[in-house]
Structures are given as structure tokens and as C-alpha cells.
């Protein structure tokens, strides 16, 4: 089936105007991208260095949300927003949608609904760095956002593979500050370089996604400060994550435990809840907001000058 050319459009890619063409092409003319951030990690860990299109489809179908998207596209009778492709037909944005249409086409090869797909084709001279930044604008900042870990993976690739600066990424995504980009990089590196080795074969993208908020809070929390640079603390926290011994909301309470030697020792041996129990035993006010407020008030009164206390007594009378 011959492709049909439509209109041209100017698309802003990494701050530059790029003239793209809108076309309708046979579904078989497109190739999935093995560098797709949603499947990149699983593909690397599989050891498959030359995946076939069927291999890539399998990885994509295993992603959460795939079945729901396939149902939506099937009921709609196709897709309306064009997928973005390179000049040679390799998919830049829309790998999951291409997989859905390809799968439906295999099931109903005679149906005209699944024979073609709308595309927006980039010219040959667009550099890969600009394409990677375009994906960040779509999926890190745009309405069709990837899961948090996939977004972090894309940010990490922009810095380490394409040599983009945190400032450039912040400008392109618009919803992240330079500091937030740096924190994202720190959290990603911690998960990849310290948590994954501790977890071994148990890690996959679902695991890493479930621990993302923990890692981000760990690198953001100001109270952790210099404690965060202690190798033993980093190792202990990685162990807590791999053994599911700390919840996301509990990371914020970690500094209090690390300031107590006994609680820290229990933390490393038995997990967060056991360590927090040590603190509660030493200080019962931890479990009661009223008692904590009374404790603070008592401390403030103890620091007041005698004349101020006498004035208070006189006023009460």
C-alpha cells in the first residue's frame, strides 16, 4: 500500500524550527525503537543485544497500561494523533500505539482500520540529541507523561549520553527546576548503582518504580544532610528498600532515627519500624501530638527569664 502525503508543519525541536510532514503509512513500514525508555532497562538486563521487532513488541506488551490502551484504540477504530517517526520510519514517539495497531492488524489483516497509521515524519538532519530532548518535552513535561522512573531514565540519558546540562533540561521540560533535575539524577544513580546491586535478580522496572519516591526523598531531605554521604547509611537504606522494610512516607522520619545510636543500630539489623519503636520507648511523646506540643512548651518555659515567668504568674492571678 502506498503512503499518502499530507500537509507540512513546523515543529519546535530543542528550540529550533523543524519542518515535518504529515503522512499516512502502512503499519508494516514502521520500526519500533529499542532505545525506548519504557523498555530500555528490561532490554539491557535481558542481554538481548539484537532484539527483533517481535521481541520489542513483547517487552512493550508487558508494560502496565498496555491492555487498557489496546482496548481504547480498538473501540475507537484507530488512532488520531500521529506517531512521530524519523526519516527512515523508526518510531520516536508512539511505540506503544504502533504495537497496538500492529497487533490488531495481525488479528484482523483484512480490516482497513489497522492497515495504516498517521505519522509525523522528521527530516534526516535532526540530531539524536534534539530528538531525545523532544521526548523529554512530551513525556517528562507534557500531558502524556511516563512513569517516574522512565522519566528519570530519560533525564539521565540526556545528561550522560547526549551531554545536555541540567539547565537545558529544565528549560525544555519547563516543569522542573535545575535543582529538581539534579535531584532526579542523584536519585536515579542511587537506585541504579547502589540499590539494584543489593537487590540482585529481584529488580525490574516495577520494583524500581515502586522505590522511586523513597530514593527521591532520600536525596532531597535536608535533615539527612551529611548523614546521606555516610556509606554505611546508604548501604543500610538500600537494604531497607530491597527488603521492603520502609514505606515512602517513613523516609521523612529517617533523620530522627539516624541521630540516635541505638535506633540506628536496630535500623540496620531489623528495619524502620523496629528502629522507630526504640525511639518511642525512649520518648513516649513521639506518638502523641499533644504531648509533643506540651514538651516543646515546657522547654520554652524553661528558657524564659525569671522576670517573664513572674509576670505570667501575676497575670494569671
Give residue spans per PLM region.
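Amphipathic, charge-rich alpha-helical segments that serve as recognition/docking helices
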Residues: 53, 57, 113-196
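Charged/polar low-complexity intrinsically disordered segments, enriched in acidic residues
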Residues: 258-317
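Exposed alpha-helical structural elements
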Residues: 51-55, 68, 154, 180, ...
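Short, charged/polar connector segments at secondary-structure boundaries
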Residues: 2-113
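Amphipathic alpha-helical "recognition" segments
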Residues: 110-117, 152, 177-257
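Short hydrophobic/aromatic-rich motifs at helix boundaries and adjacent loops
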Residues: 41-44, 72-75, 124-128, 137-140, ...
Amino acid at each position: 500500500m502506498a503512503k499518502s502525503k499530507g500537509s507540512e508543519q513546523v515543529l519546535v525541536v530543542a528550540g529550533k524550527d523543524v519542518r515535518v510532514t504529515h503522512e499516512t503509512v502502512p503499519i508494516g513500514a514502521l520500526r519500533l525503537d529499542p532505545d525506548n525508555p519504557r523498555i530500555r532497562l528490561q532490554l539491557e538486563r535481558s542481554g538481548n543485544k539484537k532484539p527483533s521487532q517481535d521481541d520489542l513488541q513483547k517487552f512493550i506488551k508487558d508494560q502496565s497500561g498496555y491492555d487498557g490502551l489496546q482496548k481504547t484504540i480498538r473501540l475507537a477504530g484507530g488512532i488520531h494523533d500521529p506517531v512521530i517517526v524519523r526519516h527512515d520510519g523508526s518510531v520516536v514517539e508512539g511505540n506503544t500505539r504502533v504495537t497496538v495497531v500492529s497487533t490488531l492488524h495481525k488479528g484482523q489483516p483484512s480490516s482497513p482500520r489497522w492497515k495504516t497509521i498517521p505519522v509525523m515524519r522528521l527530516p534526516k538532519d535532526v540530531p539524536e540529541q534534539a530528538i531525545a530532548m523532544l521526548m523529554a518535552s512530551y513525556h517528562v513535561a507534557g500531558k502524556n507523561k511516563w512513569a517516574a522512573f522512565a522519566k528519570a531514565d530519560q533525564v539521565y540519558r540526556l545528561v550522560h549520553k547526549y551531554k545536555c546540562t541540567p539547565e537545558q533540561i529544565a528549560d525544555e521540560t519547563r516543569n522542573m527546576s535545575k535543582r529538581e533535575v539534579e535531584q532526579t539524577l542523584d536519585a536515579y544513580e542511587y537506585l541504579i548503582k547502589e540499590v539494584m546491586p543489593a537487590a540482585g535478580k529481584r529488580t525490574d522496572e516495577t520494583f524500581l518504580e515502586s522505590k522511586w519516591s523513597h530514593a527521591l526523598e532520600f536525596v532531597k531531605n535536608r535533615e539527612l544532610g551529611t548523614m546521606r554521604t555516610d556509606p554505611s547509611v546508604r548501604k543500610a537504606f538500600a537494604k531497607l528498600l530491597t527488603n521492603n522494610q520502609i514505606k515512602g512516607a517513613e523516609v521523612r522520619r529517617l533523620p530522627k532515627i539516624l541521630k540516635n545510636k541505638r535506633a540506628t543500630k536496630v535500623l540496620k539489623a531489623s528495619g524502620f519500624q523496629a528502629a522507630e519503636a526504640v525511639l518511642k520507648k525512649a520518648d513516649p511523646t513521639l506518638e502523641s501530638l499533644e504531648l509533643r506540643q506540651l514538651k516543646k512548651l515546657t522547654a520554652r518555659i524553661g528558657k524564659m527569664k525569671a522576670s517573664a515567668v513572674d509576670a505570667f504568674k501575676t497575670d494569671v492571678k
